[in-house]
């Protein structure tokens, strides 16, 4: 198991004088040299790696790399569990580690934990304890072995969900018998922008300057068109290793902007997987010395914003005659447009302008193959008479628990009045 290595920002790689000298490793390059680890102790996993220790310019061995990549699996049953939760802004991810006595397979085997909520904006100083409830487990691509990442949600000591715990309500929605019977699928397209550290300007752009107009950068290759591919690829592999249901990646329309897709995932799993994928991306950009932003419009002007398009279907939508079910769902979504917009991410009004492949934030629309609509239906869905819809309104900084839960609630549990339904159907030219 090869771990993702950070670019080395504190040392340069050179061989000693009696060997061939190679060019130095800068902070923008990945330290990607590995040797298979030969241990005399009995191995508990099939493949192990360690970083190649090289001499720095002063001749000292970089022991930290050896320790960071040390696989302790052959020597102890204990594992490291990284407890991850969402902080006080509703978009920041926090984590801390603890030792668990043996490998686990289910969150119920893990203990609850606590943290200082006054330091994350989630509790007052005189009553600062917030309790972490383990909810989902993923393999840890940084530590390897049997070590794990644990997605948690947050509660008061009395067992009440705190205000930033959006998972709790989503879990209630997805536990409803009607929702369970419809087996809701979600495919989430997470866009993000990579920024140069300390200058708050996109990766690959001259500081304070602008590249050529949009057009050459989407899904492009080349040093003058693609910036940050190493980060995107490292993240892709880390997600696959972790067990995240990642389904693809691509470079986006604005240079320095990327996207990854997660799904199809069922119910609450969609939110768990997106949050874990975001955590991995934060860790990888941290190692790379690059800043990750989920701002929906990081650069003003004639540049695309960053969204989190959410593809959605139910069992009824995927079966014969499903297009009629999709149209009924679109009708319901139109009637709750304001409720959805208010929950679809902060600063989304800067992105949803009606330009740059977006609909206006003030009006609801739908169309087939139209990326300027609120809800897009694909050509294949129209042709086959069944499939899914794409909600193009969510911003890149949306909470996936909120968005997925709201989609299920509006389309499966909420019923409009007959009068409102008729008026909306007429306005949207929907015969339902």
From Swiss-Prot:
Occurrences of domain GS beta-grasp (ranges): 79-159
Catalysed reactions listed for this entry: L-glutamate + NH4(+) + ATP = L-glutamine + ADP + phosphate + H(+)
Top-level taxonomic group: Eukaryota
Chief place of localization: plastid
Disulfide bonds: none
Coiled coil residues, start to end: none
Subcellular locations according to the entry: Plastid, Chloroplast
Keywords: ATP-binding, Chloroplast, Ligase, Nucleotide-binding, Plastid, Transit peptide
PROSITE patterns: GLNA_1, GLNA_ATP, GS_BETA_GRASP, GS_CATALYTIC
EC nos: 6.3.1.2
GO molecular function: ATP binding; glutamine synthetase activity
One Gene Ontology biological process: glutamine biosynthetic process
Residue ranges of domain GS catalytic in the record: 166-432
GO cellular component: chloroplast
A matching Pfam family: Gln-synt_N
Protein family according to the UniProt entry: Belongs to the glutamine synthetase family.
Function text: The light-modulated chloroplast enzyme, encoded by a nuclear gene and expressed primarily in leaves, is responsible for the reassimilation of the ammonia generated by photorespiration.
Subunit structure: Homooctamer.
Protein name: Glutamine synthetase, chloroplastic
Organism encoding this protein: Daucus carota
């Amino acid at each position: 198991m090869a771990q993702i290595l950070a670019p080395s920002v504190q040392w340069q790689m050179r061989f000693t004088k009696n060997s061939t000298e190679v060019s130095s490793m800068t902070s923008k390059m990945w330290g990607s040299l590995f040797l298979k680890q030969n241990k005399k102790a009995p191995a508990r996993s099939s493949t192990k790696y360690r970083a190649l220790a090289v001499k720095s310019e002063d001749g000292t061995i970089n022991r930290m790399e050896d320790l960071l990549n040390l696989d302790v699996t052959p020597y102890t049953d204990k594992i490291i569990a990284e407890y991850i939760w969402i902080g006080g802004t509703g978009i920041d991810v926090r984590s801390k580690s603890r030792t668990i006595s043996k490998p686990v397979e289910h969150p119920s085997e893990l203990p609850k934990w606590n943290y200082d909520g006054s330091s994350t904006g989630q509790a007052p100083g005189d009553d600062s304890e917030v309790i972490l409830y383990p909810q989902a487990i993923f393999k840890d691509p940084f530590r390897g072995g049997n070590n794990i990442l644990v997605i948690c949600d947050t509660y008061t000591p009395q067992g009440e969900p705190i205000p930033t715990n959006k998972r709790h309500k989503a879990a209630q929605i997805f536990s409803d018998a009607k929702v369970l019977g419809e087996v809701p699928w979600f495919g989430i397209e997470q866009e993000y922008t990579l920024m140069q550290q300390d200058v708050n300007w996109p990766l690959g752009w001259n500081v304070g300057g602008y590249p050529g107009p949009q057009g050459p950068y989407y899904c492009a290759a080349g040093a003058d068109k693609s910036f940050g591919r190493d980060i995107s690829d490292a993240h892709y592999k880390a997600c696959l290793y972790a067990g995240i249901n990642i389904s693809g990646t691509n470079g986006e329309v604005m240079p320095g902007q990327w996207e990854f897709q997660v799904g199809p995932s069922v119910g609450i799993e969609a939110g768990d997987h997106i949050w874990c994928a975001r955590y991995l991306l934060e860790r990888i950009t941290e190692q790379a010395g690059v800043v990750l932003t989920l701002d929906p419009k990081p650069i003003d002007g004639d540049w695309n914003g960053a969204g989190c398009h959410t593809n959605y279907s139910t069992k009824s939508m995927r079966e014969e005659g499903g297009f009629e079910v999709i149209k009924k769902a679109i009708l319901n979504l139109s009637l709750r447009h304001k409720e959805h917009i208010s929950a679809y991410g902060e600063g989304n009004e800067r992105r949803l302008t009606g330009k740059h492949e977006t609909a206006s934030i003030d009006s609801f629309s739908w169309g087939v193959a139209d990326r300027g609509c609120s809800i897009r239906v694909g050509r294949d869905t129209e042709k086959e008479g069944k499939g899914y819809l794409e909600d193009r309104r969510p911003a890149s900084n949306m909470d996936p628990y909120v968005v997925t839960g709201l989609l299920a609630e509006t389309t499966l549990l909420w019923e409009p009045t007959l009068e409102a339904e008729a008026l909306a159907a007429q306005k949207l030219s929907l015969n339902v």
